[in-house]
Amino acid sequence: MSYRKLGRTSSQRKALLRDLTTDLIVNGRITTTEARAKEVRKTADKMITLAKHGDLASRRKAAAFVRNVVADVKEDGDDIRVQSALQNLFEELAPKYADRNGGYTRILKTMPRRGDGAPMVILELVD
């Protein structure tokens, strides 16, 4: 199994992929370098596939990878409902992609980064 090292140690690389995958789940799109986006695409597809399974084991595997961050806050009068990234993954993204077999993300190339000329892309979830 091949992967990109991204110029980091294994723990730093895993933390980077966890952060970027969580940001993609929460926001729906992220701007990053092309190499990072290609790696995040793999992990994001795996997380959405786990969410589509929907069982307890899949939820625990996804919870071990996705960061525990607030995805959305909704107010209904006196009630405040806080939705985490994991809830967003299982309650919104899994039903959205129920009929799709993979390919949940899209990479759009943008201008190179000013400063070092790194190829930048927008990684977004397909509608």
Swiss-Prot record:
Keyword Ribosomal protein applies: yes
Record bears the keyword Ribosomal protein: yes
UniProt keyword list: Ribonucleoprotein, Ribosomal protein
GO cellular component: cytosolic large ribosomal subunit
Record-level Gene Ontology MF annotations: structural constituent of ribosome
GO terms, biological process: translation
Family, as annotated: Belongs to the bacterial ribosomal protein bL17 family.
NCBIfam families referenced in this protein's UniProt entry, alphabetically: L17
Subunit structure: Part of the 50S ribosomal subunit. Contacts protein L32.
Protein name per Swiss-Prot or TrEMBL: Large ribosomal subunit protein bL17
Taxonomic lineage from the root: Bacteria, Bacillati, Bacillota, Bacilli, Lactobacillales
